[in-house]
Amino acid sequence: MASRKYEQRLRAESSEATRRRILDALEQRLREAPTEPVSMDEIATRAGVARTTVYLVFGSRAGLFDALTTELWDRAGLADLTEAVAHPDAREHLRGGLRAGVQIFAALRGVAVALFSMSALDPESVGGAIVRQEERRWGGMEYLARRLDEQGQLRADVSIEEAADVLWVLASFASFDALYTGRGLTADQVASTLTAMAERTLCRDVEPATDA
């Protein structure tokens, strides 16, 4: 029995190591040549496995890109974003969420450019992975807009729908990269700029604190 469990553990470790090599190969390939199409044969060769192994591990080309995008976002700081969303104050949720999103994009900038660029050329695999990430992001924007409204933070002339649209634009990779790459701002400066834009556009003025 002990021998069987040991063999099962070795097989599991071997499977995880294979999965890791394939994901690492894809990430490295995207960083090296972000504008060139990705071939499964090339990824298999880089990972030192057969092409069929890639499909056995991930099910499909789309499954491979889904797994990579999920891992990249997790590794880059998704936990910080989750923490921001859980903050009881909607305004702090807004600030922390934008800050965490910017840090994720900054950490992933090279690969993110490749993924977003390739999504239009490869809509079924790369595009599908990005679409699913963006759908989750949109859900987050709607949730934040509702929270701001429920806590009386939205300006009277801004609807929940309008707030969600504005947040969607400001929290996008395109907005981040326009400031980070286009203007040469640091990640902290980008986060501060986007947060200021969001609060000035959407939120009521905060009453200054007064001494009791």
What residue ranges belong to the model's regions?
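DNA major-groove recognition helix of helix-turn-helix
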Residues: 58, 68-69
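Key DNA-contact positions within bacterial/archaeal DNA-binding proteins
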Residues: 52
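Hydrophobic alpha-helical connector segments
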Residues: 67, 80-107, 164
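Amphipathic alpha-helical packing segments from all-alpha helical-bundle domains
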Residues: 103-114, 125-151, 161-165, 192, ...
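Basic, helix-initiating cap at the start of DNA-binding domains
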Residues: 1-48, 56-57, 62-63
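Hydrophobic/aromatic-rich alpha-helical bundle segments in the mid-to-C-terminal region
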Residues: 149-197, 205-212
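Short helix-capping/turn signature of helix-turn-helix
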Residues: 58, 117-122
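Short, basic, alpha-helical segments at the C-terminal edge of helix-turn-helix-like DNA-binding modules
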Residues: 40, 69-77
